[in-house]
Amino acid sequence: MDELIKEFDRYMDLERNLSTHTRKNYLSDLNQFKIYLEENHRVPTELKTEAWQNVDYMMVRAFLGALYRRRVKKVTIARKLASLRAFFKYLHQKRKIQCNPLEAVSTPRTEKYIPAVLSVDEIFVLLNLPFPEDVFGLRDRAILELFYSSGIRVSELTGINEEDMDFSQGLIRIRGKGKKERIVPIGQPASEAVQRYMMKKPGSETSGKAVATCPVPLFVNRRQGRLSARSVARILSKYVSMSGLQKQISPHTLRHSFATHLMDAGADLRSIQELLGHESLSTTQKYTAVSVNRLMAVYDRAHPKARGGH
């Protein structure tokens, strides 16, 4: 990898505290741009500082144009542009380049993203399935209950350790994006589901003794290793198929449903922002749009004037 990209990655890790997932996206986007420069602008394979110095805004615009022609989604293009902005801003601040070519490139408008959500009835269909009573069935129930009860991200769920659970207070310590910690409440059904799982989980009885030296993952696979995000998605997919719900449902759908149902019940945006671990309130505001859309749908179905009645 190019040395300056490596430096930028270290900066994002140590000084900006960005998550591994975000840094991986940055590196992927920057390496894609690097390959584009090599193939289309005869920039040397081993990019040096001088080569980055020669990148101008026309090259960046041509790269974005190539993405548009390949019909890459606008939201993905916007993310790639954000990666380039962060990288060239870093190079400019560190005086690796004299001019920042991204200052002349405007950000494209993206479609307003409104997340998919499940209704409360659909959530109950999923959570009331007959889960197996072995340790893995108990684990799977605990995972689904915890997702809907707390609204955490899949990366946060897989990162939970046994010592992060405070059953007496009904709280979990969560390590979120940018390695930031927050405390999240969970409801009684989720708390009980996790405790039933832990009672059958191998080695869980002695986990308290191991806390000081080595964190004990809460959710584990058959080899007692920490469950991966991909495995969690597969587990959810299995139960969605069993439920008969004809929808694409991911772990993030449960997070969106959690937030939207709180909004529907009258929770304020600031509280939802804190629960979800959003840095910006504008990120949380998309749930307002979901709630308004749902409200309008109910109005259209129920109000006589909406149906053209007299």
Swiss-Prot record:
A single BP term in Gene Ontology: chromosome segregation
**Whom does it interact with, and what assembly results?**
Forms a cyclic heterotetrameric complex composed of two molecules of XerC and two molecules of XerD.
Compartments annotated for it: namely: Cytoplasm
Q: Tell me the active site.
A: R153, K177, H252, R255, H278, Y287 (o-(3'-phospho-dna)-tyrosine intermediate)
* Gene3D superfamilies (UniProt xref): 1.10.150.130, Intergrase catalytic core
Q: Which UniProt keywords apply?
A: Cell cycle, Cell division, Chromosome partition, Cytoplasm, DNA integration, DNA recombination, DNA-binding
Q: Which residues form the Tyr recombinase domain?
A: 113-300
Instruction: Name the chain's protein.
Output: Tyrosine recombinase XerC
Residues forming the Core-binding (CB) domain are 1-92
GO molecular function per UniProt:
DNA binding; tyrosine-based site-specific recombinase activity
Q: Does the keyword DNA-binding apply?
A: yes
| Cited function | Site-specific tyrosine recombinase, which acts by catalyzing the cutting and rejoining of the recombining DNA molecules. The XerC-XerD complex is essential to convert dimers of the bacterial chromosome into monomers to permit their segregation at cell division. It also contributes to the segregational stability of plasmids.
The record, for InterPro entries, names: CB (IPR044068), DNA_brk_join_enz (IPR011010), Integrase-like_cat_sf (IPR013762), Integrase_catalytic (IPR002104), Integrase_recombinase_N (IPR010998), Integrase_SAM-like_N (IPR004107), Recomb_XerC (IPR011931), Tyrosine_recombinase_XerC/XerD (IPR023009)
